[in-house]
Amino acid sequence: MKLIAGLGNPGKKYERTRHNVGFMVVDELSFRHQTPWKKSKFNGMTSEIIVGGEKMILVKPLTFMNASGECIRPLMDYYNIPIEDVVIVYDDLDLPVGKIRLRQKGSAGGHNGMKSIIQHVKTQEFNRIRVGVSRPLKGEVIHYVLGDFPKAEQPDIIAAIQKSADAIEDFAQTPFIEVMNKYNQK
């Protein structure tokens, strides 16, 4: 069993924002597999998919970004999912729009959702997919990440969401290191 967490903020107001690209990836997986979202007792929405015989629990924390770990850790404990079977998907300002980067460990890199998860799981060594949203040319980062993708960026971000979902489906049957090597070269 795997736990795939897409990070974002709950509510219509944030639905299509850069900061919610993690939600968009797990929504894509739920859509592909035609599985419903259900409210979890761990302050999140969950959906279960089966890929190649492997159950994957998709989660969208409802805690708001900065408290994502408060949802992830209890789900890991409840389902007895080891850290190596967890993937966190989130937005990254340091990658160009549409680029994805898979890693098995690393710091939070200034991302508050990742800081919360690292604090709650007590390690930086877990799988993650960073989805590029780029940096603003000027202005405050907070307004930028809480803004929607402009029309010109939509084809690139849609491709990145689909590629991220493909990588997660591959992870059902393939060690993350191999998935990482495959998708980081594209």
Curated annotation (Swiss-Prot):
One Pfam family here: Pept_tRNA_hydro
GO molecular function: peptidyl-tRNA hydrolase activity; tRNA binding
Gene Ontology annotations for the cellular component aspect, listed alphabetically: cytoplasm
Catalytic activity: an N-acyl-L-alpha-aminoacyl-tRNA + H2O = an N-acyl-L-amino acid + a tRNA + H(+)
EC number: 3.1.1.29
Site (Stabilizes the basic form of H active site to accept a proton): residue numbering on this chain: 91
Lineage top rank: taxon: Bacteria
Free-text function comment from the UniProt entry: Hydrolyzes ribosome-free peptidyl-tRNAs (with 1 or more amino acids incorporated), which drop off the ribosome during protein synthesis, or as a result of ribosome stalling.
Residues flagged as site, Discriminates between blocked and unblocked aminoacyl-tRNA: 9
Any one biological process term the GO annotation gives: protein quality control for misfolded or incompletely synthesized proteins
Keyword match RNA-binding: yes
Similarity comment: family membership: Belongs to the PTH family.
UniProt source species: Listeria monocytogenes serotype 4b (strain CLIP80459)
Protein transport recorded as keyword: no
Chain positions recorded as tRNA binding sites: 14, 64, 66, 112
Protein name: Peptidyl-tRNA hydrolase
Subunit note: Monomer.
